[in-house]
Swiss-Prot record:
EC number: 1.7.1.7
Pfam families hit by this protein: IMPDH (PF00478)
Entry protein name: GMP reductase
GO BP term, pick one: purine nucleotide metabolic process
UniProt lineage: Bacteria, Bacillati, Bacillota, Bacilli, Lactobacillales
Native species: Streptococcus equi subsp. equi (strain 4047)
Alphabetical list of NCBIfam families matching this protein: GMP_reduct_2 (TIGR01306), PRK05458.1 (NF003966)
Family listed: Belongs to the IMPDH/GMPR family. GuaC type 2 subfamily.
CDD domains named among the record's database cross-references: IMPDH
Amino acid sequence: MFNDMPVFDYEDIQLIPNKCIINSRSEADTSVRLGNYTFKLPVIPANMQTIIDETIAEQLARDGYFYIMHRFDEEGRKPFIQRMHEQQLIASISVGVKDYEYDFVSSLKEDAPEFITIDIAHGHADSVIKMIKHIKAELPETFVIAGNVGTPEAVRELENAGADATKVGIGPGKVCITKVKTGFGTGGWQLAAVRWCAKAARKPIIADGGIRTHGDIAKSIRFGATMVMIGSLFAGHIESPGKMVEIDGQSFKEYYGSASEYQKGEHKNVEGKKILLPTKGHLADTLTEMKQDLQSSISYAGGRDLESLRRVNYVIVKNSIWNGDSI
């Protein structure tokens, strides 16, 4: 039990404003650097089948946003890399840790992707460390993201193995039920876990899960994240791959977790669930709104770029964000 560590989540934190130094919020720079590339926003749509597909990945890359393609179309990954490179776009894919993934990684030497994410639920594992070392040996120029983890020890071990960034978050997402099924996780204290892990990190941290509002992006950065992976806020768009369902004349999109039986195709070791989200507008509009809100956050922080968010003070007031209201 960690009695000496502050425990809080996104809804418990309010950031304290500083004097604004820009004339217009549009002057605020929301760009972020990851590896050798600069992206428009520090956000990543979750690498889940109901969030991203090849069409969305291509559009995000073309428009200057970072993405991670999911790993559930295994045979399609190599052709995907080739198509992205033919269009002079970055290729960012996911892999697991099963034996056949080693041969797959080795097969990419002639056309290596710029980014590979090792994507398993419990990333503090010998199998992940072994895969990191294999990727770095076979594809030394590829930026490796490893996860998911929830402790400083895990971050240090994965970094020492060669990971270029670590993904922090065990079960805080809206369609993840890890904490219910296993008793383990960062659900309910995800932001504190990000802070805890970031203090130990020498390389970028990606906060993954638990994001419910655009303001949570700024809070993630304040507590040490370089990038923020988001599921539910990116689900349910017109372009989203999730199946469309109509109920009483209203349209919904399916959104399910990567460890759900809908993803796995069987009821075994299930740690995810499926929900229906009212269909939103276009993904591009959500990205624009996220950028505008983050620019406002930077203006409140008294700065010109994301770095200013890391220096603001904050208060912990449990469950205070809505103050009895909702949006």
